[in-house]
């Protein structure tokens, strides 16, 4: 089966800065992916490359088996919703929704109307007069109602309050069940979307440092908690992603413990606690950044 997205050694440079650096990924159809990373890690640049809005410095990109650059047959199957979306100054919400079918063949006007009601949007208000939350809600509606086979959300929902964000997650999951497609969510709100994500791509300094199913990733790292001496003995010779403590109590984040090692830790009086996806992302990017600084 041909992947929806396939890249090989994809690189985008701005002068001496490699915003995307040697990225090789494959994304399958009908899955929800999380594209995670810190500010400036390369998330938006990568999505801009995949949607034909940026030109690669080197490497290859295939979307639906061919290049997305100036390719109408590909781009009409793609929806890219981003926080910095721009509209004509005189556009109202109703104009955005009326023009959407020109770009998205699978547009569902009834679903869009239901979402307008859900988010309580004023259809006759100009886009430039909207609050940040209302502006974000318009992007969410377009992304969902487009039903594009490949849909990118580049943090357009940051302006939404907690209730509205949960509404977005609920509507996304429900509609995805009825109308499967490939969805890529780029967000800093990792714990909020963790249960939606089937696969995680973690990018740092332009490089993909994690490309793994979410369930596999969650089980790959654990916190080992206990007395300092016991934790130090257990973690000796192991990769420790992070360690902190208060007084004599220490917590060390370690990766890839076998069942036998987990049993040995408990027999040594140590407690094993789960690491959330957000904590894992923080620990992995901290570790990668430290390695980069040491090699610089």
What are the residue ranges of the model-derived segments?
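Conserved ABC transporter NBD signature motif
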Residues: 27, 58-73
């Amino acid at each position: 089966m041909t992947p929806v997205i396939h890249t090989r050694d994809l690189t985008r440079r701005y002068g001496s800065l490699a915003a995307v650096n040697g990225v090789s990924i494959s994304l399958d159809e009908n899955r929800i992916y999380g594209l995670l990373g810190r500010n400036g890690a390369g998330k938006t640049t990568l999505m801009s490359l995949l949607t034909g809005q940026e030109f690669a410095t080197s490497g290859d990109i295939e979307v639906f088996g061919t290049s997305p650059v100036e390719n109408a047959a590909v781009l009409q199957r793609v929806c890219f919703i981003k926080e910095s979306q721009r509209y004509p100054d005189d556009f109202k919400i109703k104009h955005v929704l009326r023009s959407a079918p020109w770009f998205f063949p699978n547009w569902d006007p009834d679903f869009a109307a239901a979402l307008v009601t859900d988010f309580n949007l004023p259809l006759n208000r100009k886009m430039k007069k909207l609050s940040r939350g209302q502006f974000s809600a318009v992007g969410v509606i377009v992304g969902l109602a487009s039903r594009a086979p490949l849909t990118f959300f580049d943090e357009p929902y940051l302006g939404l309050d907690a209730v509205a964000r949960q509404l977005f997650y609920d509507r996304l999951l429900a509609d995805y069940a009825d109308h499967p497609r490939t969805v890529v969510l780029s967000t800093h709100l990792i714990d909020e979307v963790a249960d939606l994500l089937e696969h995680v791509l973690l990018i740092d300094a332009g490089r993909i440092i994690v490309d793994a199913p979410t369930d596999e990733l969650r089980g790959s790292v654990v916190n080992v908690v206990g007395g300092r001496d016991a934790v130090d003995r257990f973690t000796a010779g192991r990769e420790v992603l992070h360690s902190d403590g208060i007084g004599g109590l220490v917590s060390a984040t370690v990766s890839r413990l076998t069942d036998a090692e987990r049993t040995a830790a408990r027999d040594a009086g140590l407690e094993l606690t789960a690491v959330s996806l957000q904590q894992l992302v923080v620990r992995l990017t901290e570790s990668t950044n430290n390695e980069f600084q040491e090699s610089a």
